[in-house]
Regions:
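Two-component/phosphorelay signaling modules centered on CheY-like receiver
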Residues: 13-32
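C-terminal output/effector regions of signal-responsive regulators
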Residues: 123-124, 130-176
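Active-site residues of response regulator receiver
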Residues: 55, 82
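Receiver (REC) domain switch/output surface
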Residues: 94-96, 111-123
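Acidic catalytic/metal-coordinating carboxylates
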Residues: 36-39, 60-65
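Receiver (REC) domain active-site loop signature in two-component systems and cognate sites
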Residues: 49, 58
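C-terminal output helix
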Residues: 88, 106-115
């Protein structure tokens, strides 16, 4: 079983207490609690939990608003906790980057799979984003090399092959 650091955000103190107890029984560490969306976002940024467990309806910023900000910055996996399971709410949760969805009252046997799946999806998304950034850098480098090769070819009236050879020789001699 995986153990996660979890941020709990719910405006109901009794629900937060029950969730903390349940999570700790399951071997997780509750690293912070918030009673509104603004504090949930702020705590997620500072504490960097594995998972943020957010209620939908909270003051100052909803759980969906906090989820969107947390997801946009790739801070942690977000699991939404709500009493609502209607299609529009699920659509909003999906748009906000929520990776799992639990309907209140949360049952013990549902929470562990939701946390594990959300964390796995978060790791996958982070890896894909990292790969995309590396590919983007590679494309930019290839474009820069292509343009430099073109400049060499025009200035020295040489073939593409000769321009490539000179660039490679220069890179080797300068230790690149």
């Amino acid at each position: 079983m995986h153990n996660f650091s979890v941020l709990i955000a719910d405006d109901d103190a009794v629900i937060r207490m029950d969730l903390r107890s349940l999570l700790e029984e399951l071997g997780h560490t509750v690293v912070g609690e918030a009673d509104n969306g603004d504090d949930a976002y702020r705590l997620a940024r500072s504490l960097r939990p594995s998972v943020a467990l957010l209620d939908v309806r909270m003051p100052r910023a909803t759980g969906l608003e906090a989820a969107a900000a947390i997801s946009r910055e790739r801070i942690c996996a977000v699991v939404l906790l709500t009493a609502y399971s209607e299609a529009p709410m699920i659509e909003e949760a999906t748009k906000a980057g929520v990776l799992a969805y639990l309907v209140k009252p949360v049952r013990r046997e549902e929470i562990q799979p939701a946390l594990q799946i959300a964390q796995a999806r978060f790791r996958e998304l982070t890896a894909i984003e990292h790969e995309r950034n590396e590919l983007h850098e590679r494309i930019e480098t290839d474009d820069l090399l292509r343009r430099a090769r073109g400049v060499l070819m025009r200035r020295h009236a040489i073939s593409e092959r000769e321009a490539t050879r000179r660039m490679q020789a220069q890179a080797v001699s300068s230790g690149v």
